[in-house]
Amino acid sequence: MTQITEKELKKKYLDLLSQNFDTPEKLATEIINLESILELPKGTEHFVSDLHGEYEAFQHVLRNGSGNVRAKINDIFKERLSTKELNDLTALVYYPEDKLKLIKSDFQSCGQLNVWYITTIEHLIELIKYCSSKYTRSKLRKALPKQYVYIIEELLYKSNEYQNKKSYYETLVNQVIELKQADDLIIGLAYSVQRLVVDHLHVVGDIYDRGPQPDKIMDTLINYHSLDIQWGNHDVLWVGAYAGSKVCLANLLRICARYDNLDIIEDAYGINLRPLLTLAEKYYDADNPAFKPKKRPDKHERLTQREESQITKIHQAIAMIQFKLEIPIIKRRPNFEMEERLVLEKVNYDTNEITVYGNTYPLKDTCFQTVNRDNPAELLPEEEEVMNKLLLSFQQSEKLRRHMSFLMRKGSLYLPYNGNLLIHGCIPVDENGEMESFEIDGHTYSGQELLDVFEYHVRKSFDEKENTDDLSTDLVWYLWTGKYSSLFGKRAMTTFERYFIADKASHKEEKNPYYHLREDVNMVRKMLSDFGLNADEGRIINGHTPVKEINGEDPIKADGKMLVIDGGFSKAYQSTTGIAGYTLLYNSFGMQLVAHQQFNAKEKILSEGIDELSIKRVVDKELQRKKIRDTNIGKDLQAQIDILKMLMHDRYLD
């Protein structure tokens, strides 16, 4: 193979680039454009975390931009519109289709409705002009409904200084109404406002878990204009199942059964659970209280006795399969240090007791009828067959393939972004705050390097789905449950104890020291520095652990260097947190933390226009307004400018 010098490579690269910029005027125009963009204010970043399948609450937070939409409406119209008019306009922007139906039903004549159309279109155009004031025209155009771009741009940039175009603008709007396009235009304008108030979305983990509609969240994210994802422990569990880990698959099926969410598997992703049910009905009883499904807070109709019976049996069957599948992984990976989790081998089947961590406990609600006490890891032939069928169904689900591929494409274990570190779980440390080490494939890693190696193996496992018991696939499961995992953040997962031991002391899961050390500003500064970030300016933005505001816990920790934004989208946590989640806004002026009250139904917002969700707290204000130049995107643009200037000097100025 012919060696190519750096000089030759540079020439070939510039030759290719010059094909796009074949005149100095074209090149100069692009440089001028990019240099100018660097001077614009940075766009608004929106941080959300721990969605846990709660689609209704999540989509509402997206629609209102964590209160940003109402703030913009107030900025412009507070002195000009009544409270009711402000509320109606807010509800219209949030839920345009639904609000339009309600408003139109109030009018007695077409004339009255047409006057409302004209006024509303004017208000929405004014709102878009305000929301887009820090964007280029090109970027704004991409946010507008394609079919109405020409009309909207004419109204946005109208100049009527000499009255020459007054009737032109009036005719534009009147024709929209006359040709029955007003509803669609208003709907398009409302969604444009939603898009413009947030430039970029960060999802700091756990799209999946016990909530009923993670698939709808994934569809929404796939269609979102700009975002990134930091994987959560539940997200990696689903990725692992799709990538070929049967133990990850058993875990997520068990969680779905426990929280009465098996319809995610069957209805949302089209996976047939009939073979699992057949197995469960053959071996398990319906009256085991430890395995009855939890009542779903969002589900109004109760399960029938038959449905509850089937789920209880499935729950036992898949839990036993999970405990069996864990054994060979723990044995072939001694570096995982999980010998205490060989739970089925630690059971005394004669006395119905177990000894774990030096303590012996009596067992309750047991269902060991498929366990071979001489070889507890052994699957029954029908258990093996069921898992093979389920794994094949998972990997052949087109919708699941689309969702998992998107998670891999947009996701990572952590992300340095605009000077901040975004991470779902933790950075594993010891009691002294030193990065904990973990051995993988004969090498020892810690801190950022450990997270990079974990991520490498997640991607390798995903790319090699046919391998189901290789190191990479085992490490995906370890991320779910291992003590040095940055996603789990605890010393052991006590699933077995929670089902079968009455003594709640055995259920306790000890957290990594990170979770109390993150209160220390010096510790957070050290972590930021270890990840190559400016400790004076940067922050860690964290999810994973619900903030118990009801007990006085503060999501702003370490003098504002650590922000924890899991306040409980999940309805199951809201009684312990006291709220329904935190989100974070970061615009060119600084950061605001937003606490959300429980989202009950959009009907109240539609009828009253009152959005009680958003209570803002200023985290800080920038001393100097941040520009695009100061962001990740700015660095990328500057790199492009440097190359274009190199081309200019090479081809046109020398």
From Swiss-Prot:
GO terms for molecular function: fructose 1,6-bisphosphate 1-phosphatase activity. It comes from the Bacteria. Residues 298-307 have a biased composition (Basic and acidic residues). Pathway: Carbohydrate biosynthesis; gluconeogenesis. GO terms for biological process: gluconeogenesis. Residues 288-307 are annotated as: Disordered. Its EC number is 3.1.3.11. It catalyses: beta-D-fructose 1,6-bisphosphate + H2O = beta-D-fructose 6-phosphate + phosphate. Pfam families: FBPase_2 (PF06874). Its cofactor is Mn(2+). The keyword Transferase does not apply. Keywords: Carbohydrate metabolism, Hydrolase, Manganese. HAMAP family: FBPase_class3. Belongs to the FBPase class 3 family. This is Fructose-1,6-bisphosphatase class 3.
